[in-house]
Design a protein with these regions (language model features):
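Conserved class I S-adenosyl-L-methionine
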Residues: 1-43, 45-52
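Class I SAM-dependent methyltransferase SAM/SAH-binding core
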Residues: 57-100
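A short acidic, Gly/Pro-enriched loop at the edge of an enzyme's catalytic core
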Residues: 102-109
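Residues lining the SAM
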Residues: 113-115
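SAM-dependent methyltransferase
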Residues: 123, 143-213
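A short glycine-rich, Lys/Arg-flanked "PGG" loop and its adjoining helix->strand segment in the class I
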Residues: 126-138
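C-terminal lobe and adjacent flexible extensions of AdoMet/dcAdoMet transferase-like proteins
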Residues: 209-241
């Protein structure tokens, strides 16, 4: 299966957005926001960057905790949902490529979580990390969370799996390309009798590769979640040098 590496430009619309909006319960988001606040270690009122932010669930949760959020995403549909949910919270929404962050040394902290890292090619992923570093003040923290760590990914990978979210069903078919170190994924959405197929691709890195990539972008690594056999998501906490 060959996947266009610009797949993300039009993936997050329609049925994919419907599923992502319903995928996680509110209490999961609250726990995740508490963990992020702890890892970022910044006071209330601090400027925090969420990239890519999707529909803004974590930006909104952190804004309610007193932080000033900027959420960046490429999907107009995701951002439309984010804006409609903003209310009186202090969040600025920006439609941008995740490599385009034109705010030198503006933010006190930043995060990229979920499965949002690794969409791009090698240079694109490196450019994203450099852009985040440029947008952070010296000494600011960056939290990168990803399931795309080879030591963990390959032990948990299923060829096919079904997911049910409300009345939506999703079949995920995985193909790991060991030459490219990419996980190519075919998503089959089934909703109201309609079937829609989309494809995505993620670059997978070893622990060492990703640590070196983060450090080359202008960070020092503060903490990495230690490897265990059953670990599915890895969190890296880094400081802007």
């Amino acid at each position: 299966m060959s996947v266009n590496l610009n797949w993300w430009e039009h993936f997050f619309e329609g049925v994919a957005v419907d599923l992502w909006l319903r995928a996680l319960p509110a209490d999961h988001t609250e726990r995740e926001a508490d963990a992020l606040a702890n890892m970022l270690a910044v006071p209330a009122g601090a400027a925090v960057l969420d990239v890519p932010c999707g529909a803004g669930r974590l930006s909104l949760a952190l804004a309610k905790r007193g932080y000033r959020l900027t959420g960046v995403d490429w999907s107009p549909e995701f951002l439309g949902h984010a804006r409609s949910a903003t209310g009186a919270t202090d969040v600025a929404w920006e439609r941008r490529d995740m490599r385009d962050l034109p705010w030198p040394a503006r933010f006190d902290g930043a995060f990229c979580v979920g499965n949002s890292f690794g969409y791009l090619d090698d240079e694109g992923n490196a450019a994203f990390l450099r852009a985040v570093a440029s947008a952070l003040k010296p000494g600011a923290r960056f939290v990168l969370e990803t399931p795309m760590i080879l030591e963990n990914l390959l032990g948990h990978l299923h060829d096919r799996s079904w997911w049910q979210v409300g009345d939506l069903r999703l079949l995920v078919a995985n193909t790991y390309d060991h030459i490219r170190s990419r996980l190519d994924i075919e998503y089959t959405f089934v909703s109201n009798g309609r079937v829609e197929v989309r494809r995505g691709s993620h670059r997978a890195y070893s622990y060492r590769e990703l640590v070196e990539l983060i450090e080359a972008a202008g960070f020092t690594i503060d903490r990495v979640r230690p490897w265990t056999r059953d670990l599915e998501v890895v969190s890296f906490i880094a400081t802007r040098t």
